[in-house]
């Protein structure tokens, strides 16, 4: 079971215009910008991550859900975790680092990826797109903590790969337990239009089966003090089932006020 239980919640979303690369611009332009931020401009502009929250339907038990959530850690966390494991901002542990690569760049480094997990090997397209020789910088490391996740987004091809519990052996080969992918246009052009729900085609590096890395806070956003898209966060458990735009869930709670994975929340800006 993938351990990372993720919900999506929405902040008050404002519209922002982003500069898009033209199709007729030379490939060298992509080389030069392979490390350009995914968040400035935000590549998921126009997706569900930037929709307005004011017109979303409100759950009839919204207040009860909000009141129940702070009680969930005491119910589900092991005793040794209760005093310190809280919802928080994480920069090195339990997040999903994203490595932006360019497979058309002759200087791009590569690594071998393999898996024996049935969640991968029983899916023909996951074998095709997430196993084998994958562009990845030599300095890449997964997030700290038990999930050991990271994502690899290729600007040249638009291929967006995500990995769960990735461990590198002494020969430099990455062994992973689960993976997911979405094939976007080169340079992620029109991503919000082509994949409004921000869902992976197959698989996942988190339970919900979405492009969760794009619901994190980018460095440029932190510097500006301004976030114009939905964010995701992790909780101790969730209700059984899931809610759009999540593709799946692994919550076990039968409490009617337990939030579902994929459910949206709004933080009062006051």
Predicted feature locations:
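Sec-dependent signal peptide recognition
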Residues: 3-9
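C-terminal motif of bacterial Sec signal peptides marking the signal peptidase cleavage site
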Residues: 15-16
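Short, surface-exposed polybasic-aromatic patches that bind anionic ligands, especially phosphate groups
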Residues: 25-270
